[in-house]
Design a protein with these regions (language model features):
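Residue-level detector of Asp-centered blade-edge/turn motifs that repeat once per structural unit
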Residues: 1, 43-46, 91-94, 129-132, ...
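Loop/turn residues immediately N-terminal
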Residues: 10-13, 54-58, 102-106, 140-144, ...
Length: 496
């Protein structure tokens, strides 16, 4: 943008060479502030200005908008600045910003390293969106937290008359009328409407069939469908408080442990079970049947259906205890995505779709992005990319069905340590090819040295990186070459 940036201990200024004038929009940010001492300024690969300060961390300026983001040290966050006094800043050709601190050495930052933000709110078992800025977080041992993403605060959302929190929270649903429905383990079902709370407990007759509520969905008539462990499948009419109950005793329900629910269309409800695979109910007839696929077709990787999810193409994604499957409702076929998604034998916890129609799958200790394309023959092609704690994810298991795509496209995933939040379209990848350097050559496990004779011949007359080629005779047939790169962007994931 043709600006000259000047700074001293007392401030920072920018001279616009185009208008031949000093920029006035920086006044009040750093200049003329006696409490701010500036030690370093650098511009990153995205054009942002980084300002290193004394005892006050780093400010990052978006030049187009004037927005300033502050980066400071946090003792409880190992990914924050190590120290708040910054003596030097340097942006290298790979987009890495190097930071020299007063007493904590040198650190570096790259957007392609940590792709996922982490918030340590405890064991997050389910997620629902309250409004544009707030999320309800169901927890294993702290009830429901209302997390305001604007303020960063998460506070208990509701306690009963005795001051108790509903624990553990397993499922949540915001119905079309704005009520929050909460399913718990061994605590029944709650309906929260502002300050009014109604509870449903297991009982005889027209009542909740089980206090263990694993999944909740709403139909087009405003009825709440309930999946429970031990109680089968129920439909609650909220106005009358009456239940329809479907169990293995009074219907063709596969078993009474129902784990997950999803609508394929207004007339078809798919459900997962703990041990009997996936079934469906026809809403018009209430007929229930097991999803088998065509004879001879691929079967489910496991009959434990942890999560059932329908995408925008009409494909039904099924997370099981030992892999990932897709059911093509048009062709009535099961597809096994476990090998493609690096998920074979893995416990698949939860599934969601982003606004670009990519699928995101959480497993034990990693998250997988699956891209879907048409093969031009009526079927699909799948590809995947896996992420783990080295990308910023929590280093623990993710929870079943604890995933949510928010209205703005951001995805939240719950695990044992908290919630990871990310914008799929903001994930950055390192596109710079690193320099590869040869670090050693061995012959019969003996290091080859410059100018030294082996078998009557000198193999390398100068340093290995300056050699065009190396020739061995046919008897010198056991050798090894070692090499490395200057890549600091997740170097452990570098492929050669």
């Amino acid at each position: 943008d043709n600006c000259i940036w000047a700074y001293s201990l007392m401030g920072i200024w920018a001279y616009d060479c185009g208008t031949k004038s000093w920029r006035t929009d920086l006044t009040g940010i750093w200049s003329s502030r006696p409490d701010v001492i500036i030690h370093a300024v650098a511009q990153d690969i995205e054009g942002r200005i980084w300002v290193g300060k004394d005892y006050d961390g780093i400010d990052v300026l978006e030049k187009e908008t004037g927005k300033v983001t502050s980066l400071v040290a946090h003792d409880d966050n190992g990914r924050s600045l190590p120290h708040n006094t910054i003596y030097d800043l340097y942006a290298d050709r790979d987009g890495i910003m190097w930071v020299g601190t007063y007493k904590k050495g040198v650190s570096y930052y790259s957007e392609s390293i940590f792709k996922f933000n982490m918030y340590e709110w405890g064991d997050i078992t389910c997620i629902e969106q309250a409004d544009e800025n707030r999320l309800w977080l169901g927890t294993n041992d702290h009830g429901i937290l209302l997390w305001n993403r604007s303020t960063g605060k998460a506070e208990p959302f509701w306690r009963d008359a005795e001051g108790q929190l509903p624990n553990p929270v397993v499922s949540m649903l915001k119905s079309k009328d704005g009520k929050l429905w909460v399913g718990t383990f061994n605590g029944g079902l709650y309906c929260m409407d502002g300050s009014r709370v109604r509870s449903y407990k297991e009982g005889a007759g027209n009542a909740l069939a089980s206090n263990n509520i694993w999944a909740l969905v709403e139909d087009d008539k405003g009825r709440i469908w309930i999946a429970s462990l031990g109680g089968g499948l129920q439909c609650l009419e909220p106005l009358s408080g009456t239940f329809e109950t479907y169990t293995s005793n009074n219907s063709a329900l596969l078993e009474n442990n129902v784990t997950s629910l999803c609508w394929v269309d207004n007339n078809t409800l798919f459900f997962g079970t703990a041990n009997q695979g996936v079934g469906m109910m026809d809403m018009r007839t209430r007929e229930i049947k097991k999803i088998q696929g065509q004879s001879g077709n691929v079967k489910l990787s496991n009959d434990a259906g942890n999560h059932v999810y329908k995408d925008s193409r009409g494909l039904v994604w099924i997370a099981t205890r030992e892999g990932l499957n897709v059911y093509d409702t048009r062709r009535h076929l099961f597809l096994d995505l476990s090998p493609v998604a690096e998920a074979k034998g893995n416990f698949i916890a939860a599934i969601t779709e982003d606004q670009e129609r990519n699928m995101w799958v959480s497993t034990s200790r990693k998250v997988i992005r699956v891209t879907v394309a048409s093969d031009g023959k009526g079927s699909y092609l799948f590809d995947s990319r896996a992420y783990n704690s080295e990308d910023g994810l929590q280093n623990c298991d993710f929870n079943q069905r604890s995933i949510k795509t928010l209205h703005n496209g951001i995805i939240a995933i719950g695990g044992l340590y908290g919630v990871n939040v990310f914008a799929p379209d903001h994930i950055r990848y390192n596109k710079m090819l690193p320099n590869v350097m040869f670090t050693g050559l061995s012959l019969f496990d003996e290091a080859v040295k410059v100018g030294q004779s082996y078998g009557g011949r000198v193999l390398i007359e100068k340093e290995l990186n300056d050699v065009e080629n190396v020739e061995f005779d046919y008897k010198q047939n056991i050798f090894s070459v070692s090499f490395a790169s200057d890549n600091y962007n997740l170097s452990e994931k570098t492929q050669y």
